């Protein structure tokens, strides 16, 4: 039996006007401007419950209304080859469904811990709205044959093509019998995949399923790529207020710590750089540095501060990124490579939440999959 299965999806008829970035990346002013200027924006659906006493039910009604309109077209169950062309690279993968039973059997390998409160909140949301609007992203190992098959499909004219925020998006529906048969045969060779983005969404789907044991089989909407295409980045961690007494505990538990120039960037010798009360330090590498990152997160969590996160761009130092925020504590680190992530997942380990920031990131509202 193949790891992945075909899905019946709804796709927007005007994707360049409909799709959005992650909802939380828009400011209130941006959301208001877009919703005023663009009646087709997916923000209208997500904002439907903003002033409602039952917000998730209001969003569900907004979904039902839009799916009955001409804004979305329903397609027969199948696979979609999806290509994202960015300025620096091109991603080519497969949009398909990962059955819940595969997740329960451990075939979706995880590498990052999650926040329980967020899972419960997202699970309750999914339970009410009954729609998945953003795929998880997962990587497939030893997928050269699959990549060749997918790239062969991209030679033809795409079923859908549009540009959003300078990126070109192309979709090919797999409808010819020969390609479909070859694709299913190739998918049958995979026993598992690695979750790259969407740990909370995957956990929330299991939450919903656990509350409705007798419902129809549930699939996790996903975008599946060969591992070689995954691009690794990382987060900044910062804490606005941290007791000064925490410094002694931190230095005692972390091992060799050395002060350094404020603009020091993480490197192979000093993979973790942090700033504490306006002084910058590095943690010296001793064997694998990843356990030190886990220990740092644990110590911060035990002190009960509010840890905040945002993605780190290449070559950004702590002083560059926090010049206006001046938090008591900030940290940046080398991205974990896919090989390191794979090792964590294969040994059933867990990186701290918000440790890995991996590309590609997908749009919301491009694929709708009813539960």
What are these regions (language model features)?
Residues 1-371:
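Surface-exposed, charge/polar-rich loops and edge strands
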């Amino acid at each position: 039996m193949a790891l992945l299965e075909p899905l019946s999806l709804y796709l927007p008829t005007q994707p360049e006007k409909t799709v959005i970035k992650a909802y939380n990346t828009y400011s209130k002013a941006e959301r208001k401007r877009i919703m005023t200027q663009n009646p087709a924006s997916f923000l209208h659906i997500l904002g439907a419950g903003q002033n409602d006493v039952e917000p998730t039910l209001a969003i569900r009604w907004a979904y039902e209304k839009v799916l009955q309109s001409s804004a979305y077209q329903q397609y027969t169950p199948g696979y979609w080859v999806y290509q994202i062309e960015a300025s620096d690279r091109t991603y080519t993968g497969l949009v398909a469904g990962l059955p819940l039973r595969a997740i329960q059997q451990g075939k979706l390998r995880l590498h990052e811990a999650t926040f329980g409160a967020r899972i419960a909140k997202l699970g309750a949301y999914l339970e009410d709205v009954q729609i998945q609007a953003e795929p998880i992203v997962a990587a497939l190992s030893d997928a050269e044959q699959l990549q060749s098959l997918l790239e062969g499909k991209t030679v033809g004219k795409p079923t859908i093509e549009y540009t959003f925020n300078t990126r070109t998006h192309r979709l090919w529906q797999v409808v010819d019998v020969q390609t479909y048969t070859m694709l299913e045969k190739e998918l049958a060779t995979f026993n598992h995949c690695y979750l790259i983005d969407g740990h909370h969404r995957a956990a929330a789907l299991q939450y919903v399923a656990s509350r409705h044991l007798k419902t129809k089989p549930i699939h996790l909407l996903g975008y599946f790529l060969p591992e070689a295409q995954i691009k690794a980045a990382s987060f900044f961690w910062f804490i606005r207020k941290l007791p000064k007494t925490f410094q002694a505990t931190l230095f005692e538990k972390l091992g060799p710590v050395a002060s350094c120039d404020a603009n020091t960037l993480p490197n192979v010798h000093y993979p973790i750089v942090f700033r504490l009360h306006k002084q910058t330090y590095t943690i010296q590498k001793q064997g694998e540095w990843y356990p030190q990152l886990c220990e740092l997160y644990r110590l911060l969590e035990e002190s009960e501060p509010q840890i905040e996160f945002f993605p780190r761009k290449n070559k950004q130092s702590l002083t560059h990124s926090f010049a206006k925020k001046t938090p008591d504590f900030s940290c940046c680190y080398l991205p974990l490579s896919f090989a390191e992530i794979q090792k964590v997942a294969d040994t059933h380990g867990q990186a701290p939440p918000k440790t890995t920031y991996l590309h590609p990131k997908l749009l919301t509202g491009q694929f709708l999959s009813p539960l």
